[in-house]
Amino acid sequence: MIEQPVSPKRKYELKRRAEKQAETRRRIIEATVKFHSTIGPARTTVARICREAHVQRATFYRHFPDSALLFEECRAFSLRESPLPDMTSFAEIADPVRRLRSALTAIYPYYRQHEQRMAAILRDADGLPGAGGAFFRFQDRLSELLAAPWKSRGQRHARILAACGHAVDFQAWRSLASRQGLNDRAVVESMVTLVRAAAGQA
């Protein structure tokens, strides 16, 4: 059987349909990110998203039949809009204290800029495993990167890794910066002191 060529009109209709579907999907993602960033994932309902995105429930579920897919798309969207600090530049610094100070100096302004959004999302992380996943993975990788140049083993390595994990933890930064009123430079030096103490350099 010989396939009939698709007419220009049909091609145009298919293209317009795909564009409309992509636009609808984008509106749903943007609406979800908006609510995740303000009231948090736990309070973000399908009804809220549908009202904000101007879609029906059936349309929402056609695009996102499960929450895991929606979380993944929202993570990708957020990281495109507000990418996490690049860790490659820190990895090139051999001195452990300089690497630590450089990394914290880069990430704390990011925390400050996105504090409301991160606080809303991470607040719900315990009850919603999908919330904050990309950021927690970033924290874990960064902690390991900062602990590596100390070249420690055993319990000493465990202490250094834990201290580095605390230093890059958003909630730890928030406690010192927002609640205690320290500026980012002061928080950096406080965390450097903590990690050096864990390494036995206090």
What are these regions (language model features)?
Residues 30, 97-119, 188-196:
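Amphipathic alpha-helical segments that line or abut small-molecule/effector binding pockets
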Residues 1-55, 69:
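Basic, helix-initiating cap at the start of DNA-binding domains
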Residues 64, 123-127, 167:
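Short helix-capping/turn signature of helix-turn-helix
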